[in-house]
Amino acid sequence: MADSKEIKRVLLGPLFDNNPIALQVLGVCSALAVTTKLETAVVMTIAVTLVTAFSSFFISLIRHHIPNSVRIIVQMAIIASLVIVVDQLLRAYAFEISKQLSVFVGLIITNCIVMGRAEAYAMKSPPIESFMDGIGNGLGYGVILVLVGFLRELFGSGKLFGIPVLETVQNGGWYQPNGLFLLAPSAFFIIGLLIWALRSLKPAQIEKE
């Protein structure tokens, strides 16, 4: 029987209290690479959430049958299989987005969040709790990704999901797009500001010197 309190903790905790990017500083590379557009940020969020949830679920199911000496290999094999499925689905049904995400879908295999939850939680917890933990951490990762993608696309090109929101000077409007937001360093600054804002609201997350 699944523990409802534990499910609530693992599902909601990673959103703000224990965010994978803002607190644990994991998965930052893909956060820089796929957030120039809100659309790619949302798709990457869905992909990572599904892979993290299902890999944790399957690893938890067989955790008592995995020899300790090969557990990392087994975890990576399960994660890689799920990533291949996600990649093929994107190629089949969202080819343009698949091209934009490029190698970063494949690199979900080595994403610290996915591997970390498999090793730290799924290997020690029941399947349902592990699945919900995967959902929670995927969404926690996605909250930061979507916020960064929102700001970068809006201020970098005046669009959201490719639809003009701020009328640009080139089209007779008032907004001059800020090209800096389309460069990778801007994502560093935005993530840094989000971490600062979150830790200002939750002082307990500030590291002790």
From Swiss-Prot:
Alphabetized UniProt keyword annotations: Cell inner membrane, Cell membrane, Ion transport, Membrane, NAD, Sodium, Sodium transport, Translocase, Transmembrane, Transmembrane helix, Transport, Ubiquinone
EC number(s) per entry: 7.2.1.1
Residue spans crossing the bilayer: 42-62, 66-86, 95-115, 131-151, 178-198
Principal localisation: membrane
InterPro entries named among the record's database cross-references: NqrD (IPR011292), NqrDE/RnfAE (IPR003667)
Entry annotated with the keyword Manganese: no
GO cellular component terms listed in the entry, alphabetical order: plasma membrane
Membrane topology qualifier: Multi-pass membrane protein
Alphabetized GO MF terms: oxidoreductase activity, acting on NAD(P)H, quinone or similar compound as acceptor
Annotated Pfam families: Rnf-Nqr
Subcellular location as annotated: Cell inner membrane
Gene Ontology annotations of biological process type: sodium ion transport
Reactions catalysed according to its record: a ubiquinone + n Na(+)(in) + NADH + H(+) = a ubiquinol + n Na(+)(out) + NAD(+)
PANTHER family attached to this UniProt entry: ELECTRON TRANSPORT COMPLEX PROTEIN RNFE, NA(+)-TRANSLOCATING NADH-QUINONE REDUCTASE SUBUNIT D
Purpose of the protein: NQR complex catalyzes the reduction of ubiquinone-1 to ubiquinol by two successive reactions, coupled with the transport of Na(+) ions from the cytoplasm to the periplasm. NqrA to NqrE are probably involved in the second step, the conversion of ubisemiquinone to ubiquinol.
NCBIfam families noted in UniProt: nqrD (TIGR01939), PRK09292.1 (NF006777), PRK12405.1 (NF009070)
Subunit details: Composed of six subunits; NqrA, NqrB, NqrC, NqrD, NqrE and NqrF.
Annotated family: Belongs to the NqrDE/RnfAE family.
Protein name: Na(+)-translocating NADH-quinone reductase subunit D
Annotated organism of origin: Serratia proteamaculans (strain 568)
Phylogenetic placement of the source organism: Bacteria, Pseudomonadati, Pseudomonadota, Gammaproteobacteria, Enterobacterales
